[in-house]
């Protein structure tokens, strides 16, 4: 029996590794464009991108570089590719005409829905509708008019049969030749024919399968959607080890092992990877996080700025050196590394979790404690595994993204993950780890997501800095015996319910909250004028926070 998909560490929580930007407004749209480009199967000559005029992309268009991400994805770039920032220039060089349209959207009700309508140089056509669901994760809604949901965790072989000519014997023969089949679906649509989709753990050989795929019949064609995620789903995936801290703690007590060891086992069950691979992968991510927090201070790099994106890290460094700083100790160091995390330097890869760069804010809080307490890299690594477990529970029970649960889902979840990680790092008990996470999340429950276009990263930066800088405080409260009352899963459920009750204008559409204030309206007007007069390649990366 196939196990239903569930969140895992390297796909959902700490991923995708990407260029600076929003995970849901930059990495996600890029990935959907990448799928659309593969569906087309040849270089594009015409790229039409349709966006919901009432959706989130319409509200923030430009300030998060959704446009460059979508176009770059169609050109074949993944979220970690620095060429994304030159997507329009490269599309023009390739002879591809690009247009965007804001319209009524009927194919999806998700606030982060997008439709790609592509024409290729050889005359092929392709349409893909998809949703950016948060944290860089995506889902397809339709491909070439056929309903199909896939999240990029397998290879997907698509067989289109416009005239319904492929018989059962041919289907059976094809399926016998497919390697490591994870799942399949078949759907018919009047006027379009039949689509058969095969989810595979390894890439099929289209050349070898060509006879079976097309069967020499008119109106039959095939395409492959390549995986987007580092961990590819397997047929023998084990069930989810835990979906609450209560269950997680029970396993740790029964097995007499620390929480981080149970977290490693969770990922082994989810991914099928051996223990050594998982630890090495987390260590690699920790290295990327370390560079993101420190590159602006330690490397000879240019920090891209604009009238709407100042060099916050440079300002903080000058202030700290002046002797006038009020914050000191762990808090001052957390601020320093957090500003480094948000520098938005092309080529300095970032690790989301759950928002763009979120893992690096978590790392900033952890690293400040590591410095102050003289802890080892292994101590920090153990904390990251605990943070990943908290993130997996959050993704299981909620949708930690601004478009669904407001800034609670992003800054609030990051704060909970960081508080839990710090408590683990300094030797807290499993109960104290849970209390720290729940206390932190409760403090940030109910926050809207209302990024101000042209508002120098406000109020987003205030919130993530608050969550980051309070993480060690909530760890201390838990260590001192302050009980959270709500177990973590209940705190997540409460935050989810409140977040989903917020009106659309408070869910990353830049239509309400702080965005409705007169000063914010003036910022928007200034930004829109600058955006209209500037070229895409002249704009800094879309690192809002």
What kind of region is each of these model predictions?
Residues 24-40, 163-167, 362-375, 419-427:
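Alpha-helical support elements that line or immediately flank enzyme active sites
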Residues 48-97, 385-423, 431, 436, ...:
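A structural-propensity feature for long, helix-poor, extended segments
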Residues 147-163:
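Short glycine-/aliphatic-rich beta-strand segments at the starts of folded cytosolic domains
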Residues 3, 14-17, 32, 37-44, ...:
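Regulatory modules associated with amino-acid/nitrogen control
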Residues 88, 129-133, 145-150, 187-207, ...:
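C-terminal regulatory domains involved in ligand/effector binding and gene-expression control
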Residues 14-35, 345-365, 407-414:
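Conserved phosphate/anionic-ligand binding catalytic regions in large, soluble enzymes, centered on
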Residues 86-100, 424-545:
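Functionally critical mobile loop/hinge segments
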Residues 134-136, 159-183:
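Short amphipathic alpha-helix segments
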